[in-house]
């Protein structure tokens, strides 16, 4: 895994920036990249986004609740953010592009397809049945029932989910 700062080995989603951008910092065909993806999938990914901190890490918070101070300090301590799904999506696409082995490429494509289908299913329900009808919340609790919290209609959440769906429809 990559860490946010030297001396802090907490697992966070920021490591995906190194592989999700147009010009990746890490070779997306490397073992390091595959390890990062596996850790993110196992420890941070859920249907509503990526947790900002892995469960079990010091200061982990999975429910966004309490007074203003408690809520503000929990934002980046495990709460789920939908917009971070865009980093995961772009990382998978970059890994597929750079993968030379046909079997591995097929497996990555299957993971991407499953992810996109889950994203469509999850957020179609959100758009029509929960929270602010027609929108997506800023954040979600990181445990079932994954309640929408924070800003009830967040532009960057909507934008990333719509981008994932739109790009999938255009392929």
Locations of regions flagged by a protein language model:
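Feature representing long, continuous alpha-helical segments
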Residues: 38, 79, 83-90, 110, ...
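C-terminal substrate/ligand-recognition segments
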Residues: 61-100, 162-166
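Generic alpha-helix detector with strongest preference for long hydrophobic helices that associate
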Residues: 69-73, 100, 104, 108, ...
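Structural helix-adjacent loops and short alpha-helical linkers that scaffold large soluble proteins
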Residues: 22-38, 92-117, 169-171
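Catalytic cores of carbohydrate-active enzymes
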Residues: 1-63, 118-158, 165
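Broad hydrophobic/π-residue packing in well-ordered secondary structure
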Residues: 1-2, 21, 74-75, 81, ...
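Short amphipathic alpha-helical interaction segments
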Residues: 76-80, 104-115, 128, 149, ...
